[in-house]
Every structure is written in C-alpha cells, then in structure tokens.
Regions:
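N-terminal capping/linker segments that flank leucine-rich repeat
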Residues: 1-37, 140-212
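Tandem repeat scaffolds
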Residues: 19-155
Length: 212
C-alpha cells in the first residue's frame, strides 16, 4: 500500500512509500532513513507511537494531536512545528530542537528533553509531569530545569524556569526581576507597572520558594 506524506500548505508530495501492511509510521520512518526533508509535512493526528525518528527534519510540520508516545526523536529538528495537544509521553527528545514550536496542551510526561532547545516554544498548558528538563534550554543560557511552573490566565503567560522568569515576551534572570526598579518595569510595556505592582510578590515567591 502506498502512503504519501504531503505539504500542509500546497498538498505537494514530500515523500511516498509503498510496502505491505504500510502505515504512516512506517512511511515516516522510511522518509527519515532516506534523509527526506519533511518540512511542512501534514501529520495531523498521526499514530507515531514508538517511531524511530532520530535526526528527523520536520520543521514547521503540522503534528497537532499526533500520537508519539515513546517515540525516538533524538536530535530531531522540530523548529516551528505545530505539536498542539500532541502525545509525547515517554518520548526521547534528547538534543532535539523545538524552537518556536507550538506545544500548547501537549503531553510530555516522562519525556526526556536533556539538552533540548525550546527557545520561543509555546508551553501553555503543556503537561510536563516527571519530564527530564534539567539541562533543557529556552535559548542561550536559559536553563528550564525540572518542574517548571506555568501561570496562565493573567495579562501575560508566566513561565518560571530554573534560572529565569519569562513574563509575556520579557525573559530575565530571577535576580534581575527581583532587582528591577519601578522605572525599569515601566519601560517594558504600558500595562507593566500596574501588573507588576499587583503580582510581583506572588511571582517572586513562586520563583524563589515555590519552585524548590
């Protein structure tokens, strides 16, 4: 049976594979072995549990709701990929690049993200229970660490990492947030002063005490 992996935007066939008892998983694995460029691939809702995708190039692919539990994605390029509500429980994402990926609502429980780069990734509602993030980064020098805290529902989403706090698009070390003057905060955004006056104590407590 022949299965085609197509471009999410124009329907162009990026890779095709034909074998007996074929599946999307087998086709994608064949594409990876062939070193196919699968940027923009439409893999929405695909069943890829346990797939061997080490080193895959899937930049800006559409993998919303895909099942990738226990998949092997070491060193994979997933920059800008839509992984909204994807199931990545137990997946091996060691050294994967996930910059600007959409991980809203994704399940990453027990996933290995050692040395993964998540710079700019959207993590709103992501489930990271027992995920290994100790050496994962959110850009150069920003260590995520295990058990990051996410605060949603306020004016801006807040990510509290091991070394840094990200509020909206502002990301600084915990110590920098602690030491910012009112004037520093006011320069960030027109609503920042009112927001910081209201939530500063709560955010800093969670950053320095609640994350221990």
């Amino acid at each position: 049976m022949r299965i085609e992996i197509k471009d999410r935007f124009n329907g162009k066939v990026l890779f095709a594979h034909d074998q007996e008892n074929n599946s999307v998983k087998a086709t994608l694995e064949a594409g990876i072995r062939a070193k196919a460029d699968l940027s923009y691939a439409d893999l929405n809702g695909a069943n890829l549990n346990g797939a061997y995708l080490n080193g895959a190039y899937l930049g800006e692919a559409y993998m919303s709701g895909a099942y990738m539990c226990d998949a092997y994605l070491r060193g994979a390029y997933l920059g800008g990929t839509n992984l909204n509500n994807a199931y990545l429980n137990g997946a091996d994402l060691d050294s994967a690049y996930l910059g600007d990926a959409d991980l809203n609502g994704a399940s990453l429980s027990n996933a290995c993200l050692n040395n993964a780069d998540l710079n700019g990734a959207c993590l709103n509602g992501a489930k990271l229970n027992s995920a290994n993030l100790e050496t994962a980064t959110y850009g150069e020098g920003v260590i995520i660490g295990n058990n990051p805290l996410f605060i949603l529902g306020l004016t801006w989403p807040i990510y509290i990492f091991k070394t840094h706090i990200k509020i909206g698009c502002q990301i600084h070390t915990k110590q920098e947030w602690l030491n910012f003057s009112d004037a520093d905060i006011a320069k960030m955004e027109s609503r920042a002063s009112e927001f910081w006056a209201k939530w500063k104590k709560h955010i800093l407590w969670m950053a320095f005490e609640g994350s221990k």
